[in-house]
């Protein structure tokens, strides 16, 4: 259910936040601007109440704290109420923009130095995450906010982070999954690294490493075709031994 302006949401640590306004929504939930003891924060509120395993893992992540300052990490967990729950995190500063804006050329980096800095920041963030014993599991182009002037990066949507070897239950996007995960495998830090290479390729080339002539010729990208093009029959667009999926102007992001 949608929350109302002025509504109070109780936290497991005590106290409550007050809803100010909606900031945005997606497939999993709604993000609200909230007031926490006079400080502005963001609340992610789930459209569907998660199961106990997910909720307890989220609670543990709040206790453990963020692997680094690059993560917009869950800071507080709400009680289960009004048919669902959510968590509190820091707000994204206004000078940071979604990665998709860079892919669509709505935003551009101020310099190559800034672009390289963004790549290094993303790699460092996930290195720290893995050092803490976590796997991200749902790495995609919607997980990053970037400052185009400096290349500084903030990593969001960290509620799906799980201990290495465990599965969050959140299905990622096939375009960013390792082929074995598309086929039904369990995500881990190694599949995270595959997804990371896809992100870096897209950052530098503004195109997907598996999207060339084959995907352009696809009449409709159904789930079965996704499993084929990103899983069982994935072909790198610059594969030296297979030119069947070379870059196509229509396939550029």
Regions found by a protein language model. Name each.
Residues 2-37:
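ATP-binding glycine-rich phosphate-binding loop
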Residues 46-70:
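The N-lobe alphaC helix and its flanking beta3-alphaC-beta4 segment of protein kinase-like domains
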Residues 167-181:
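Conserved activation segment of eukaryotic-like protein kinases, specifically the C-terminal portion
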Residues 192:
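Conserved catalytic-loop aspartate of Hanks-type protein kinases
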Residues 72-118:
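Conserved structural core of kinase catalytic domains
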Residues 126, 130-148:
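Catalytic-loop of the protein kinase fold
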Residues 200-249:
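Conserved C-lobe activation region of Hanks-type protein kinase-like domains
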Residues 252-253:
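Conserved small/polar residues in nucleotide/adenosyl-binding loops
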């Amino acid at each position: 259910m949608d929350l109302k302006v002025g509504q109070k949401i109780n936290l497991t640590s005590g106290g409550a936040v007050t809803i100010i306004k909606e900031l945005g929504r997606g497939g999993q939930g709604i993000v609200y601007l909230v007031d926490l003891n006079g400080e502005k924060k963001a609340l992610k509120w789930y459209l569907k109440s998660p199961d106990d395993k997910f909720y307890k893992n989220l609670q543990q992540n709040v206790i453990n704290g963020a692997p680094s300052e690059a993560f917009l990490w869950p800071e507080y967990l709400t009680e289960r109420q009004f048919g669902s729950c959510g968590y509190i995190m820091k707000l994204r500063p206004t000078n940071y923009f979604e990665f998709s804006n860079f892919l669509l050329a709505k935003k551009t980096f101020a310099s190559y130095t800034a672009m390289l800095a963004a790549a290094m920041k993303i790699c460092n963030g996930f290195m720290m995450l893995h050092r803490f014993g976590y796997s991200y599991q749902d790495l995609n182009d919607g997980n990053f906010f970037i400052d185009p002037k400096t290349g500084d990066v903030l990593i969001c949507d960290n509620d799906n982070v799980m201990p290495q070897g465990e599965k969050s239950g959140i299905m990622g996007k096939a375009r960013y999954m390792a082929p074995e995960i598309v086929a039904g495998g369990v995500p881990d830090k190694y599949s995270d690294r595959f997804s990371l290479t896809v992100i870096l390729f897209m950052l530098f080339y503004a195109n997907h490493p598996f999207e060339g002539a084959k995907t352009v010729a696809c009449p409709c990208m159904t789930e079965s075709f996704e499993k084929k093009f990103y899983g069982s029959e994935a072909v790198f667009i610059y594969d030296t031994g297979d030119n069947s999926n070379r870059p196509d102007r229509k396939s550029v992001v």
